[in-house]
């Protein structure tokens, strides 16, 4: 069995298990900054809107060198489901993300991918997340886009 497919399958099982204990959250808007890791070291910025645990995000990665060559500035668009299982302590809550993404031409992955994330919410104000975009072997070019994001989270003003 393909290691990537096995990893994605395990993550989906963990996401489903966490979903049974999930807490619903209010609508939020988030702004984040981060840096790619493993296959590149490029700055990333993102903005997102979450409604009933579904989040739509737009991310922008700077141009620069990657493991597979030079990459132009990259836009990533994603839709994800976020599960916060309620296993946290004193305002520090873990969460998991599973979604799909599209990008404008990465050297590391194909145009359409899965988006996986694991993170920690700090008192519903900040969240720290490790993000992975990958096609799970659908595309030949599947090195993966990995980055760490720090997001400021605020209640939606509407």
Where are these regions (language model features)?
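Cleavable N-terminal export/targeting peptides
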Residues: 1-28, 158
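Transmembrane beta-strand segments of Gram-negative outer membrane beta-barrel proteins
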Residues: 24-35, 94-98
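Residues that define the transmembrane beta-barrel architecture of outer-membrane proteins
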Residues: 27, 39-45, 50-52, 70-77, ...
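Repeated loop/turn-to-beta-strand initiation elements of outer-membrane beta-barrel proteins
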Residues: 28-30, 53-58, 86-94, 122-130, ...
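Transmembrane beta-strands of outer-membrane beta-barrel pores
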Residues: 33-39, 51-53, 60-66, 83, ...
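Detector for outer-membrane/organellar transmembrane beta-barrel domains
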Residues: 49-99
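Mid-chain, well-packed structural core segment of small domains
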Residues: 93-113
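Outer-membrane beta-barrel "beta-signal"
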Residues: 120, 142-158
């Amino acid at each position: 069995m393909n290691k990537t497919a096995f990893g994605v399958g395990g993550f989906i099982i963990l996401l489903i298990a966490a979903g049974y204990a999930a807490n619903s959250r209010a609508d939020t808007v988030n702004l984040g900054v981060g840096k790619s890791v493993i296959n590149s070291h490029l700055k990333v910025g993102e903005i997102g809107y979450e409604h009933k645990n579904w989040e739509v995000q737009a991310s922008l990665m700077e141009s620069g060198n990657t493991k597979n060559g030079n990459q132009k500035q990259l836009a990533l668009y994603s839709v994800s489901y976020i599960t916060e299982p309620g296993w946290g302590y004193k305002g520090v809550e873990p969460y998991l993300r599973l979604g799909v993404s599209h990008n404008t031409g990465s050297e590391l992955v194909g145009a359409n991918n899965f988006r996986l994330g694991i993170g920690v919410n700090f008192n519903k104000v900040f969240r720290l997340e490790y993000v992975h975009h990958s096609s799970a072997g659908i595309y030949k070019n599947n090195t993966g886009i990995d980055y760490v994001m720090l997001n400021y989270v605020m209640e939606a003003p509407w």
